Amino acid sequence: MPHADIRTSTITPLVRATPWLIALYFIAHVALDAVSYVQPVLKLGITPLSPQTGLVLAFLYAYRGNFWWVAAAFLVSEVVIRGIPMHSWILPLQAISITAVYQFAAWLLRKKVPMEGVATLSGTLKFIAVASVTAIIAGTVSVGLYTLSNLIPADQFSSALARFWVGDLNGILLLAPLLIRFADTPLLLRAILSRPAAFIGVLLGLFAAFTLVFLVGNPGDLRFFYLFFVPAISAALIWGVPGFLIAALALQISLVAGVQRLAEVAPLVDLQFLMSTLLVTGLALGAVV
């Protein structure tokens, strides 16, 4: 296996986060929420991209005793980024409920699908399943609260839930594995640098795809975005799951930048459903090659 040297087999024991780490988590949570606040629904925070969910799951997975810190981060982020809604009672209830969902997901992953160690297809599929269910439950709670308080019309429940779900799902699939295995970053960098030609090829592939989609082709046509699959999947075949996620992270940043800078581009929510397909495919491929 060409990327076996970037996989570890040690499951990290739970420890308490230091005050500095908690402060860093707060800053990162709010920052990720802010940069991904793109194309929201009625300024209620329902965006098609929520990278902070991956941070939340990784933090709860790696450190114990942080439920209330995470709930507070959700609450602070909502107030800072979106302001206080008409019914202010929603905010603490939403923050506590969503944190409980992610706390259970983190516990379930540690018990049944430990994220450290050699990536397997079975473990990867279980992780994807946990991420999908976590996102749909969190989405149902949030959108349900907004609907019950008449902040969202009942006939928009399903569309708002779909937007919430895909945003949370992609955040989990993309960032949680990278952050949980952050200690493996030096090994990954050495593996990448040991194959400079492959690294340059993937980098040029991402640049070429971005150029063809946003500058040459029609960014309003979703079919053009399949060009991004080629370099991302190539990274999965070369470096496994960690390499694929690095490429996917670069791709996600490119998509957000393109959507924000161009007027005529496919809706970000449609691009995120496409991104979900890529993430599931790349994670599965990276686990078996």
Predicted segments, located by residue:
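Short aromatic-rich membrane-water interface segments that cap or initiate transmembrane helices
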Residues: 157-170
